[in-house]
Amino acid sequence: MCTWRRPEYFPRTLRALEAQTGVAVRLHVWNNNPGIADDLERAAADSPLPVRFHHHPENIGGFGRFHLARELAPHHPYVVFIDDDQLFGPGTIATLLSEARPRSASGWWAYRFPLPPHYWLRLPVRRGRAAQYVGTCGMVIDTAIFLDERLFECPDRFRFVEDVWLSYVADHLNGWTLRRSRASFLFIPDTRNQFAGLIREKQEFLRYLTDRGWLRRR
């Protein structure tokens, strides 16, 4: 997971992960804000959960989780991504892991797009059904994707729209299967969410990638 502005959410995330059943959780945190490092470290010290931090000197957004996943890929076939503004029950991580498959990603936020594609006219898919986009908040994915150097060649101006880029690389460049997960999450409304400042960029990036061949009728 990544952290940036909300250290007060981190203890709740730890408690949710501590409560998971049927799995052994190890948490890797990419922190984009050195100013909250001490708060995060203190919370982790009070938890029985194994936690490893990377405190980055500048905010690189959700791309940080891709760097963590690349480090883990040689030894772990799958990784689960969560966000700090999510609430989830004790069986959630086990459900995600039960859906793990080679060359695939399964996640809670999963959509298809109309033609012509428009990000904000996206169409939700049912649980277990194929998607063209899967968000990184509440996802299990084959870590082989993080050994593909193309994933780290995202255009600089769209670096903070890494969720769209990941779906493009997985779906279009690699032909992977994307699906809606059967796991359930609740989200905490928060105006500090980085997503709120990327409304225009998400559609611009989708159009940019469509011009490069993604989301054609198939």
In which residue ranges do the predicted regions lie?
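Active-site beta-to-alpha loop of glycosyltransferases that engages the nucleotide-sugar donor
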Residues: 1-12, 33
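C-terminal catalytic/acceptor-binding lobe
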Residues: 9-13, 153-218
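Short, acidic, metal-binding catalytic loop of nucleotide-sugar glycosyltransferases
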Residues: 15-26
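A conserved acidic beta->alpha catalytic loop
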Residues: 31-42
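Conserved donor nucleotide-binding strand/loop of the catalytic core
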Residues: 46-60
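A short, glycine-/small-residue-rich helix N-cap motif at loop->alpha-helix starts
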Residues: 57-64, 159-160
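Active-site nucleotide-sugar/metal-binding loop of Leloir-type enzymes
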Residues: 66-78
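Conserved catalytic core of nucleotide-sugar-dependent glycosyltransferases
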Residues: 82, 87-155
